Amino acid sequence: MKRTTFFQLICTALLLTGLSSCGWRREDIGPFQGDQQTFELANFDRLDMGSAFTITVQPGSAFRILAEGDRRNLDDLDVYTRNGTLYARYRNSRNRQYETSFTITMPTLRGVSFSGASQSSIAGFTNLNELDIELSGASKGQFAVQAKQTNLTLSGASNLQLSGLGAALGADLSGASTLQAFAYPVNDANLDLSGASKANISVSSSLDIDASGASNVRYRGAPSVKQRLSGSSSVQTD
């Protein structure tokens, strides 16, 4: 019995030594150290953010960026602008016990790219000419907007709930992603789905669908429909 216990201790020590030599890092959890931080950045109309952030975006005449969460996570943030895009990431990769949330105020919005299991909410932007939305890595979004042209790219089991009003919609869904847009009526829509993705949309004039890999489209309205289906994919009226 003693020999077995000694052997287990030796194995554990060797494992920890190996992990340390490989640069493995674990979070020092400890108690929550709540804090907030503002970033004095301006002149951006696009967002590129990851790292499982919770993100709220709202319109306003002045730029404002507020981050809230655990002080250790806030100290690790890398937030900057380049060519009209606001970027936000952590400098170091590690498991994190506590959530970091961003509240971003900006005059107008042209596009967002959210990744890494982020959760986002956008509301209040109207009369946009074109809006690009990209969600990846199991990210979730709830957007209430108005745009003439809306371009969507959802991948990696991401989910978007879209409401408001649009004229034209282009969407590329892959990897079991989901678009819920019954509350976002458009005149024309062009959809490309693969990998068991799903889309619910409202269309009045024309609907073009390319679906593969057991994907599914449900639509409301009476548009003219062109469809190319493979791999047990389906198109249904709602």
Model-derived features: where do they sit?
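Extended, compositionally simple hydrophobic/Ser/Thr-rich segments
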Residues: 45-57, 102-104, 109-238
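Short, ordered coil/turn segments that flank beta-strands lining enzyme active or ligand-binding pockets
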Residues: 82
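Short acidic/polar N-terminal linker immediately downstream of export determinants
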Residues: 2-12, 20-74, 85-105, 121, ...
